C-alpha cells in the first residue's frame, strides 16, 4: 500500500525572478504527478504549495507555516541565496530538509539543505577557465546586489587576478532594477575582453537587451568578440530575451538543443523534477528521521556527496545560436567542491592557457 507524504513547494509565481520560479515549479509539480501515477512506488506526495511572490520577508514564515500545518519534512523551493538562508533556521527547528535546485555561489553547507544544482567548481571555475582561453584576461563584472552577485564576482575577481588577469569594472544593481544606461556606458569605455553577468531576473533581461544594442552600434561588443557570460542563464529565460540572447554564453549541468516556447526542459525544471524523484526513491527505501543522517549512509547512491550534500554533475558550456543552446565544451560527472579546497575536483582543460598578445 502506498504511503502519502506531505511535500512543501515554496516557489514565487510572480516577481522579478518569476521565470526561474515557474520553471522550477513546473519541474517539481510534474515530478509529483509522475510519482503519484507510478503504482510501482510505495510512496505518493501531497503538495503543500505556498507562493512568496518574490518578497524575501515571506519565505521564512511561509516555510514555517508549511512545516507546522502539515506533516511535511521536505520542502522543494527557493530561488535566491537570500531566500535559502532565510528558511534554514525554520528547517533547523523542524528537522526538515530543503531541496535547492538553483545554481549558487558555493561556500555553504547545511545539514538541512540538499544542493542539487551547480556549485562554484561546477559553474564559475569552468566558465572562467574557458573564457580566458578563448577571449582574454580582462573582464567586467556585473551582479545583483546580494550574496549571489557578490560572491560570484568575488570568486571570478580573485581567480582572475591570481592568474595576472584584470577586472576593469565591477558594478551591482538592486534586484529588479532595470536602469542599466550608465552601466552600459562604463562597459563601452572600459572595453573588456568579456563580461560576467550575475544579474538576476528583470535586471538581467534589461542589461542583456541593452548590451545587444551596444553590439549593434559598436562591433567590438559583438558576441563573437566580447561576449556576455552567465552562470545562471537557462532556456527558461530565452523567450523573453528574443534575439538579444543570440551569442550569450552560459554554463550548466544540461542544455536542451530545441527548447519550447515556455522554457520546458531547462536545467532548472529538470533539476527540480529529479530532486522530487530522488526523494521519492529515498522514502521508498525507508528514509526516515533526520534526512542528513540517511544521506550520510546512502547519499552516494543518488550522486549526493555525504560530506557536503551537494550533487556530482556534468558541466557544459554552451552558447545561444538561433534561439537554442549549442554546447561548446563539456566535462562529465564533476564532484562538488563548494569551498574550493579540493583542486582535484575542478574541471581540467586539455589545452594550456592561451597567451593573449596585446597589440
State the predicted function of each range:
Residues 211-277:
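Extracellular/periplasmic periplasmic-binding protein-like sensory domains
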Residues 81-86, 188-218:
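Hydrophobic alpha-helical
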Residues 265-269, 280-348, 356-358:
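Segments of small-molecule ligand-sensing domains
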Residues 49-56, 102-103, 116-125, 143-153, ...:
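Hinge/beta->alpha junction and helix N-cap segments in small-molecule ligand-binding domains
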Residues 24, 38-106:
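Beta-alpha junction/loop-to-helix N-cap segments that form part of ligand/metal-binding clefts
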Residues 4, 8-29, 50-54:
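Extracytoplasmic "Venus flytrap"
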Residues 38-54, 110-112, 160-177:
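Short beta-strand elements in bilobed, periplasmic/extracellular small-molecule ligand-binding domains
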Residues 73-165, 221, 227-241:
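Extracytoplasmic ligand/sensor domains, especially the bilobed periplasmic-binding protein
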Amino acid at each position: 500500500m502506498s504511503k502519502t507524504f506531505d511535500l512543501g513547494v515554496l516557489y514565487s509565481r510572480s516577481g522579478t525572478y518569476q521565470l526561474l520560479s515557474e520553471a522550477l515549479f513546473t519541474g517539481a509539480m510534474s515530478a509529483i504527478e509522475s510519482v503519484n501515477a507510478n503504482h510501482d512506488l510505495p510512496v505518493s506526495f501531497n503538495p503543500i504549495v505556498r507562493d512568496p511572490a518574490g518578497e524575501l520577508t515571506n519565505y521564512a514564515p511561509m516555510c514555517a507555516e508549511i512545516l507546522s500545518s502539515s506533516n511535511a519534512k521536505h520542502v522543494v523551493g527557493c530561488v535566491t541565496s537570500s531566500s535559502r538562508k532565510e528558511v534554514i533556521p525554520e528547517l533547523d527547528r523542524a528537522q526538515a530538509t530543503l531541496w535547492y535546485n538553483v545554481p549558487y555561489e558555493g561556500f555553504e553547507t547545511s545539514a538541512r539543505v540538499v544542493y542539487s544544482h551547480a556549485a562554484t567548481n561546477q559553474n564559475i571555475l569552468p566558465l572562467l577557465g574557458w573564457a580566458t582561453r578563448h577571449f582574454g584576461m580582462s573582464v567586467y563584472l556585473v551582479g545583483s546586489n546580494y550574496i549571489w552577485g557578490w560572491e560570484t564576482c568575488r570568486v571570478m575577481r580573485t581567480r582572475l587576478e591570481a592568474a595576472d588577469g584584470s577586472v576593469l569594472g565591477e558594478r551591482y544593481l538592486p534586484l529588479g532594477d532595470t536602469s542599466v544606461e550608465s552601466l552600459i556606458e562604463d562597459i563601452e569605455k572600459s572595453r573588456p575582453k568579456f563580461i560576467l553577468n550575475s544579474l538576476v531576473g528583470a535586471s538581467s533581461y534589461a542589461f542583456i537587451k541593452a548590451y545587444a544594442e551596444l553590439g549593434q552600434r559598436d562591433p567590438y561588443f559583438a558576441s563573437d568578440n566580447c561576449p556576455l557570460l552567465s552562470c545562471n542563464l537557462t532556456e527558461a529565460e530565452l523567450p523573453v530575451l528574443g534575439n538579444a540572447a543570440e551569442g550569450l554564453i552560459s554554463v550548466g549541468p544540461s542544455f536542451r538543443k530545441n527548447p519550447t516556447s515556455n522554457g520546458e526542459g531547462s536545467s532548472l525544471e529538470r533539476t527540480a523534477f529529479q530532486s522530487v524523484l530522488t526523494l521519492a526513491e529515498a522514502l521508498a527505501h525507508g528514509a526516515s528521521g533526520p534526512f542528513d543522517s540517511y544521506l550520510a549512509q546512502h547519499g552516494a547512491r543518488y550522486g549526493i556527496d555525504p560530506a557536503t550534500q551537494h550533487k556530482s554533475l556534468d558541466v557544459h558550456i554552451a552558447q545561444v545560436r538561433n534561439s537554442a543552446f549549442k554546447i561548446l565544451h563539456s566535462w562529465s560527472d564533476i564532484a562538488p567542491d563548494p569551498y574550493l579546497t579540493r583542486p582535484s575536483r575542478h574541471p581540467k582543460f586539455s589545452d594550456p592557457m592561451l597567451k593573449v598578445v596585446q597589440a
